[in-house]
């Protein structure tokens, strides 16, 4: 009850022997034993009275019913009352395949398709030459220098 080991009990005995003394120690132990016996008898009497009250009020039947209910699987009984044949559970657990028709029995609208168009200009292959600079005009070269004067 107190979770005392033998070494702890021996330590308490040695301390009691030193504090109380060898002359009075037997009388103290006898008195402590009487108190423990009296406390135990009061506890057992209280337990007996509570058992009698439970029997008189029918609480024993209630306790038995609660124990019986605790053993039964209430969740399974509820499932059987809601879905006795199991069709609802089967429909919820399986995913239906997607239907090709839309929600109202029509086929879904296809996205508008554009006719293929040819590119406006062919893209020249990269040659390593720099593209013309925006400052290059009719009298400027692509590298930005002026052409020779005639």
Swiss-Prot record:
Transmembrane region(s): 1-21
Signal peptide: none
UniProt keyword S-adenosyl-L-methionine, yes or no: no
Keywords: Cell inner membrane, Cell membrane, Membrane, Protein transport, Translocation, Transmembrane, Transmembrane helix, Transport
Keyword RNA-binding assigned: no
Family designation: Belongs to the TatB family.
Self-association state and partner proteins as the record states: The Tat system comprises two distinct complexes: a TatABC complex, containing multiple copies of TatA, TatB and TatC subunits, and a separate TatA complex, containing only TatA subunits. Substrates initially bind to the TatABC complex, which probably triggers association of the separate TatA complex to form the active translocon.
Name under which the protein is recorded: Sec-independent protein translocase protein TatB
Organism: Rhodospirillum rubrum (strain ATCC 11170 / ATH 1.1.1 / DSM 467 / LMG 4362 / NCIMB 8255 / S1)
